[in-house]
Amino acid sequence: MKAVGLVTEYNPFHNGHIYHIQQAKAVTGADVVIAVMSGNFVQRGEPALFDKWTRTQAALANGVDLVIELPTFYAVQPSHLFAEGAIKLLTALGVEDVVFGSEHATVDFLNLAKQAPSVQGGKAFQEKNQTFAQAYATQLESETGFKLEDPNDILAFGYAKAILNLNSPIKLHAIQRVAAGYHDQSFTDDQTIASASSIRLALHKGKLEKVKGVVPNQTLVDISSANHTVDFESQFWPLLKYRLMTDTIGQLGQVYQMAEGLEHRLAAVALGEPGPQSYQSFIKAVKSKRYTFARIQRTLLYTLLNVKVDQMQAAMQDPYLRILGFTDKGQAYLNGAKKTTTLPLISKVDQHLAKANLRLDFKAGKLWQLLAREPGQQQDIARQPIHFTQAHTKEDK
């Protein structure tokens, strides 16, 4: 069977994702759709609106055949590491094609990536008032004429770089984003496709009726179930503030992505008087030209999870394929992939795995449970992959 890969967050799953799945199959002629999906935390360092099992269920109900978790050590990273992790997993599964949405679908991202090795030493990197990502984009534009600034284009460039770095045989296919831009914050009543961020914003404002036209039935069911959502703002900040108050500067400095004195700035703002009263006000107080919002949020998540640099480096050297769910077709493909993949396939997590290979995912799952006020809703231990059939859904035994 021929498989096409999708790199996803599904936060939440919406009609644009259905279009993506349909186009992926049409463009490649694939028999099986495999989604590599972020777990309980997404790339920007925020908790997903719904847990990974709820989002897996929605994906399987709407055309995906196999869902593999993108481990936290890849999922909560800058775009180039996020993309490399996803391509590494899809390559290990024997996926031939990856289809992605792009703001500029006619661009040859693989050719663009081939020109990139000469970029990093350019003049743009001497500018002190830019982030690394901004400097990189500026230098790339000066050498290639293409301005890399839209989120999906940045990820596409990351996929292309990863394919070159990993010597992967995967072929890339871009499809043009339709109806909604990545950062759109609103949508009209007659739209059938809206951005995930605009859907989250509408839900935050309590506008359930408004989102009915832009999400499938399964997502509506999930939205209606308060048991699956995260109360992020009110729950995250007290935990983080306590951590910043009690850790020493030396301890904070060991956290992954804590660099250039960021630990001093975080502690000073958190301990100031009267001090920020919310997570968002804290982020805004910390923000500077040197750090993007996403960079700060990722670092704060790793602070709360107490992830050290050496722990992250070790985890990234030991990837695995965590199976979250499959259809009958996905299960058949998986049975074949087991014979050829070089990465461990994990379908059930026990205490040993939770303390070893999956330690970071396990901790992230526990934190998500805490934020969602669902202490009994296990995210990893003893959870089985979802086996989706049209007749019924079950956790595979």
Swiss-Prot record:
Q: Does the keyword Membrane apply?
A: no
EC top class, as a word: ligase
Family membership noted in the UniProt record: Belongs to the TmcAL family.
Quick one: which gene encodes this?
A: tmcAL
- Any Pfam family hit: HIGH_NTase1
One Gene Ontology BP term is:
tRNA modification
General function of this protein: Catalyzes the formation of N(4)-acetylcytidine (ac(4)C) at the wobble position of elongator tRNA(Met), using acetate and ATP as substrates. First activates an acetate ion to form acetyladenylate (Ac-AMP) and then transfers the acetyl group to tRNA to form ac(4)C34.
- EC nos: 6.3.4.-
A GO molecular-function annotation:
ATP binding
Primary residence: cytoplasm
The protein's annotated catalytic reaction(s) are: cytidine(34) in elongator tRNA(Met) + acetate + ATP = N(4)-acetylcytidine(34) in elongator tRNA(Met) + AMP + diphosphate
Q: Which UniProt keywords apply?
A: ATP-binding, Cytoplasm, Ligase, Nucleotide-binding, RNA-binding, tRNA processing, tRNA-binding
**Protein localization:** Cytoplasm
Cellular component (GO) terms are: cytoplasm
Q: Which organism is it from?
A: Leuconostoc citreum (strain KM20)
Q: Gene3D superfamilies per the record?
A: HUPs
What name does UniProt use for this protein?
tRNA(Met) cytidine acetate ligase
Residues annotated for ATP binding in this entry: 7-20, 101, 152, 177
